[in-house]
Amino acid sequence: MSLSTVNHAAAAAAAAAGPGKSFSAAAPAAPSVRLPRTRAPAAAAVSAAAVGADRAADRVSALSQVSGVLGSQWGDEGKGKLVDVLAPRFDIVARCQGGANAGHTIYNSEGKKFALHLVPSGILHEGTLCVVGNGAVIHVPGFFNEIDGLESNGVNCNGRILVSDRAHLLFDLHQAVDGLREAELANSFIGTTKRGIGPCYSSKVTRNGLRVCDLRHMDTFGDKLDVLFKDATSRFEGFEYSKSMLREEVERYKRFAERLEPFIADTVHLLNESIQQKKKILVEGGQATMLDIDFGTYPFVTSSSPSAGGICTGLGIAPRCIGDLIGVVKAYTTRVGSGPFPTELFGEEGDLLRKSGMEFGTTTGRPRRCGWLDIVALKYCCEINGFSSLNLTKLDVLSGLPEVKLGVSYNQPDGQKLQSFPGDLDTLEQVQVKYEVLPGWQSDISSVRSYSELPLAAQRYVERIEELVGVPVHYIGVGPGRDALIYK
């Protein structure tokens, strides 16, 4: 089996040749897989771009006042790019959950790469206000590092980022505990990013966590932090705790509190007031529905709700205010960490897909597991979220394959077809996937900007996905850059 010569590794290298460099270290580079390729005529690409511009304006302007971009697989679908593209038409871009475990890679107009983790992907657009909502968890040192990296690369963050006073603080001790927890689990480890996300949400649920607003009361901050340290000591034998450690941490956060103060806001009030003022809000989800604490492949999930319900609880806005929700899905499937993956490809097939798609985690650099597009899981995500449309990303990565496959149903070992996505992991791990095989396409589609210019086989692939899940594909990604997007 062979894959595309024009892959994301080549596109990223071309972008890096432009002015400036990325402020965040890129994931480990993988060798390209190169094959002869038929290129689309340049003139056709130019005319297609003109048609695409009109369609793009129509698509984006038609989005509702409060819209959302959510992942519909196991993360890493390319949500950040779509948010970056849509952001100029919105007044506010808001993160509703998660923390620095999210990794959103975007490129500015000059091709400079930015790897964002907590700061919303709308930050590259000067007129956009970025909000980190109450459902997120904030590692303050990491937050400042991200801001410093942005500003050192010419991105103005002054007065453009607000953090909810209700958001919980993620401390270094949460990260230490995360590593200890994974070590305890040994062979059954979940495969977290070890960024402390789970332990921080655990502190929130057990009600001994500290919130951003606690930084405004340093007279009691130390006592509250002491409770948190003692709890970690009692639960993890390897966690060291001393009074001097506590004093050092309190002094450190006194300095952080002064710098963070201009960013702190009652974002619940701000967002609801903005809705009253008819301002447009774009919600940027982190992770994805298949990692949802309730609906994902538990326990191999994140600790928050990256599905539609998390928008309301993570921002404090009413369900009736939410309009269009766009589900972002790769043209194939990837997963980082442990957990069942029914359509996973092993050996040479999986390796080639990983190399062509540059499938290495933005946050951890870990190689992603790769497989065919899982229609059963995608339909499940569409049901839960009520997506109004889909953004199919990385379609170009499949170029060069003689055939492409869609996992259309699950059968139990006895041959009986499952009627829904199973919540029982024992069942999920034993399913036999039934595939639908479609013809592949050989031509390079990375310069295509009009749907009609795509090879017929690629169009058929897109349309078959629409038929199977019952949701239209409005956006198609054919490369990492802002302009590498087809509006259907």
Swiss-Prot record:
Cofactor: record remark: Binds 1 Mg(2+) ion per subunit.
EC number: 6.3.4.4
Catalysed reactions, as listed in the record: IMP + L-aspartate + GTP = N(6)-(1,2-dicarboxyethyl)-AMP + GDP + phosphate + 2 H(+)
Chain sites annotated for binding GTP: 75-81, 103-105, 368, 394-396, 477-479
Residues reported in the UniProt entry to bind Mg(2+): D76, G103
GO molecular function (one): magnesium ion binding
Pathway membership, UniProt: Purine metabolism; AMP biosynthesis via de novo pathway; AMP from IMP: step 1/2
GO terms (BP aspect): 'de novo' AMP biosynthetic process; IMP metabolic process
Cofactor (UniProt): Mg(2+)
Chain sites annotated for binding substrate: T362, T363, T364, G365, R366, P367, R368
FT transit peptide: 1-47
PROSITE patterns: ADENYLOSUCCIN_SYN_1, ADENYLOSUCCIN_SYN_2
Cellular component GO terms held in the UniProt record: chloroplast; cytoplasm
Keywords, in A-Z order: Chloroplast, GTP-binding, Ligase, Magnesium, Metal-binding, Nucleotide-binding, Plastid, Purine biosynthesis, Transit peptide
Active-site residues, record numbering mapped to chain: D76, H104
Chain sites annotated for binding IMP: D76, E77, G78, K79, N101, A102, G103, H104, T193, R207, Q287, T302, R366
Compartments, record wording: Plastid, Chloroplast
PANTHER family per UniProt: ADENYLOSUCCINATE SYNTHETASE, ADENYLOSUCCINATE SYNTHETASE 1, CHLOROPLASTIC
Family from the record: Belongs to the adenylosuccinate synthetase family.
Protein name: Adenylosuccinate synthetase 1, chloroplastic
Phylogenetic placement of the source organism: Eukaryota, Viridiplantae, Streptophyta, Embryophyta, Tracheophyta
